[in-house]
Amino acid sequence: MARTFFVGGNFKLNGSKQSIKEIVERLNTADLADNVEVVICPPATYLDHAVSLVSHPQVTVGAQNAYTKASGAYTGENSVDQIKDVGAKWVILGHSERRTYFNEDDEQVAEKTAFALERGVSVILCIGETLDEKKAGVTLDVVKRQLTPVLEKVKDWTNVVIAYEPVWAIGTGLAATAEDAQDIHAAIRDFLAERTSRDVADAVRILYGGSANGANAASFRDKADVDGFLVGGASLKPEFVDIINSRR
């Protein structure tokens, strides 16, 4: 099944009004490959700003987090209704930094995912193992554990993209080999097929999210189950366009 190549840019807690303007203008004027979908995820304070600037038809905007309530006395949280209201289409959920620094667990991530989808916001769902888990040889056990509560709550996977992000590779400059990523992505897809159907699993895009950059992105080109990237630091730089065009 042909799956549209997908590149997400997670700006994390970086950027200013001016730098985000420069990033968006670079994307607006770039010669992007036809067969790619791009989502940029700036800090929440700049969501509206980014949406107002984007003019390229292949580029949309997403948030980096959302809560399980649409409104109420939840100081500091992001509402999916408000994310949608400013024109953003996506939200990143389950990122390892949210799991590590803010103690989000698998069940919370599943609740957030189900709620965002229910309210009409598409989800980039992050899963992945730590270095200790990798060394222990339990990578697949970890990603299956992370996916299981989501599978129990979400029956329609049309608007979900999975990002496999080995925690040991995020922000470290280390990266899984393209071959290793392919093996893990294929196993994730097989697990989805077991729990849903082969048709559903074959339609879900699975991204690689561990220190992808302009230098290594092309090495993933021929990997059948690597459907794109969730990019961190490199999404703030001109090389982001090279990553987007890495399958041209």
From Swiss-Prot:
The keyword Isomerase applies. It catalyses: D-glyceraldehyde 3-phosphate = dihydroxyacetone phosphate. Keywords: Gluconeogenesis, Glycolysis, Isomerase. InterPro entries: Aldolase_TIM, TIM_sf, TrioseP_Isoase_bac/euk, Triosephosphate_isomerase, Triosephosphate_isomerase_AS. One of its GO terms (molecular function) is triose-phosphate isomerase activity. Homodimer. The keyword Mitochondrion does not apply. Belongs to the triosephosphate isomerase family. PANTHER family: TRIOSEPHOSPHATE ISOMERASE. It comes from Eremothecium gossypii (strain ATCC 10895 / CBS 109.51 / FGSC 9923 / NRRL Y-1056). CDD domains: TIM (cd00311). Pathway: Carbohydrate biosynthesis; gluconeogenesis; Carbohydrate degradation; glycolysis; D-glyceraldehyde 3-phosphate from glycerone phosphate: step 1/1. This is Triosephosphate isomerase. One of its GO terms (cellular component) is mitochondrion. One of its GO terms (biological process) is glyceraldehyde-3-phosphate biosynthetic process. Substrate binds at N10, K12. The active site is at H95 (electrophile), E165 (proton acceptor). Its EC number is 5.3.1.1. Signal peptide: none annotated.
